[in-house]
Amino acid sequence: MIYPYKEKMPTIAPSCFIADYVTITGDVTIGEESSIWFNTVIRGDVSPTIIGKRVNIQDQSTLHQSPNAPLLIEDDVTVGHQV
């Protein structure tokens, strides 16, 4: 499910793979050739979440951040299962 939060819609590169049952909301940017796997939640509700190119976010991970502290995952990073 991909949806806006406070009028900010996620930006996802066309070459990304987004598995079923993923939730992405708000101020989120996902770079080229990245993959987001089953049951992952990525929130950009209190600060931006920026995911680089060729990033692999594995199953059941939750990515969130604190106010005034954006989350940045640089290029070519793997985030393991259930992080």
Q: Where on the chain are the PLM-derived regions?
A:
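Extreme N-terminal tail/first-helix region
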Residues: 1-16
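Left-handed beta-helix
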Residues: 14, 19-20, 25-26, 31-32, ...
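Active-site cofactor/substrate anionic-group-binding motifs, chiefly glycine-
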Residues: 49
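Active-site beta-loop-alpha junctions enriched in small/polar residues
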Residues: 68
